[in-house]
Amino acid sequence: METELMRIGVSLPDTLLGKFDEIIEKRGYSSRSEAIRDSIRSYISYNEWMGNIKGHHVGTIVIIYDHTQRGLSNVLTDIQHHYSHLIRSSIHIYPDREDCFEIVVLEGEGKEITELAEAIMALKGVKLSKLITTESNETDEPSIVI
């Protein structure tokens, strides 16, 4: 069965496209289109996994964001205060003049952890947001999901 391919257009900053092209060459993709398809499949798989986090979990959210984005720091703080019952610790560093790098350690119900992660991911100015969790269960060994 042959799948019909759809042509789409995407606008990207030069630096992002340059980095993507370096990865394409390093990984040996036959074309930019194949690399984009692979990236989209990975993105879909990750988001499907996020939709199925259930039960008690521990984990982290890694966030890189532009603190010069007007109001973003305040919104992030408000979101974290709303979910403060999940947050066990956080580390916040300043790698350069624009960006903030934050690691938030979480523990709680998987559904709420996912809600927190999705609220952060949706914000304009968040350059990277990655959730990593493991199920926390007293009777079983934890299973790490990345």
Swiss-Prot record:
Ni(2+) binds at residues 81, 92, 94, 100. Its cofactor is Ni(2+). Keywords: DNA-binding, Metal-binding, Nickel, Transcription, Transcription regulation. Binds 1 nickel ion per subunit. One of its GO terms (biological process) is response to nickel cation. It holds the Pfam family RHH_1. The keyword Secreted does not apply. Disulfide bonds: none annotated. One of its GO terms (molecular function) is DNA-binding transcription factor activity. The keyword Transcription applies. Belongs to the transcriptional regulatory CopG/NikR family. Transcriptional regulator. This is Putative nickel-responsive regulator 1. It comes from Methanosarcina mazei (strain ATCC BAA-159 / DSM 3647 / Goe1 / Go1 / JCM 11833 / OCM 88) (Methanosarcina frisia).
